Structures are given as structure tokens and as C-alpha cells.
Amino acid sequence: MSWQAYVDDHLMCDIEGHEDHRLTAAAIVGHDGSVWAQSATFPQFKPEEMNGIMTDFSEPGHLAPTGLHLGGTKYMVVQGEAGAVIRGKKGSGGITIKKTGQALVFGIYEEPVTPGQCNMVVERLGDYLLEQGL
């Protein structure tokens, strides 16, 4: 399966039990910042934004004072899982980032999708990739 198929079929799909509820944008990005696959709506990010995200995984709390920035959008960092998941909130939407051995799985959402639904979609794919050694 191509990386694009993971984004299209496992991240940008209808959320279980909620037809027409899906993430706003999604991507799989290597730890080095190279995009493996992304939705057409995923924001163009700056290298320093990706560096900040990677630093927060190795030094949890790094982004808390400044917020998480992606594509020029600032998210308030909310409770995640140190070294494994970063979650951010902005207005009625937000972001979930799951770290795997080689990649970061991104999901961005807006209402009516809930934070819990975004977390489930992103973390389920991230856990699968971890199980595959990726």
C-alpha cells in the first residue's frame, strides 16, 4: 500500500458511525521533515515548525510556552502523551500528532469532528505503523 493510500483511506476517511465527518487535513511526515504523503488540504509547513515538533517529542513541554505552529497556524498545546502524542487546540478545531519509529502522523480537524475522534483516527494508524516497525 502506498503512503498516499494510508492518508486517503485511513486518515481522510469517514469517521466510524459518522458519515461525512472526516479530518480537515492529514499527512505522514518523516522525522527529517520530508513529506511521505499528505492530503491536498495539508498546510505547507516551515522546517523550524517541524523542528519544534520533533523537539517536543524528545523534550516534552518544549512547545507549551509558545504553542505548536504548523503552516503559520498556532495551536495551544493540550494534554498529550509524553514522547508519543502531541495534541493542540485552536478554536473549534485542533491537531493530533502521533510519533512512530520513523514518521509523524498528523491529523487536523474542525467541528463537527471532535478531539476524541481525531485522536482515535490518528493514533490507530500510528499504532499500526509502530507494530509494522515503521
From Swiss-Prot:
Span of the annotated motif Involved in PIP2 interaction: 84-100
Pfam families with a match to the protein in the record: Profilin (PF00235)
GO CC terms, sorted: cell cortex; cytoskeleton
Superkingdom to which the source organism belongs: Eukaryota
Gene Ontology MF terms in the entry: actin monomer binding
Modified residues (Phosphothreonine): T114
Post-translational modification remark: Phosphorylated by MAP kinases.
Keyword field: Actin-binding, Allergen, Cytoplasm, Cytoskeleton, Disulfide bond, Phosphoprotein
Disulfide bond as UniProt keyword: yes
Subcellular location: Cytoplasm, Cytoskeleton
Record-annotated disulphide pairs: C13-C118
Gene3D superfamilies referenced in this protein's UniProt entry, alphabetically: Dynein light chain 2a, cytoplasmic
Note: The variability of the residues taking part of IgE-binding epitopes might be responsible of the difference in cross-reactivity among olive pollen cultivars, and between distantly related pollen species, leading to a variable range of allergy reactions among atopic patients.
Family under the similarity heading: Belongs to the profilin family.
Subunit structure: Occurs in many kinds of cells as a complex with monomeric actin in a 1:1 ratio.
Function: Binds to actin and affects the structure of the cytoskeleton. At high concentrations, profilin prevents the polymerization of actin, whereas it enhances it at low concentrations.
Protein name per Swiss-Prot or TrEMBL: Profilin-2
Organism name: Olea europaea (Common olive)
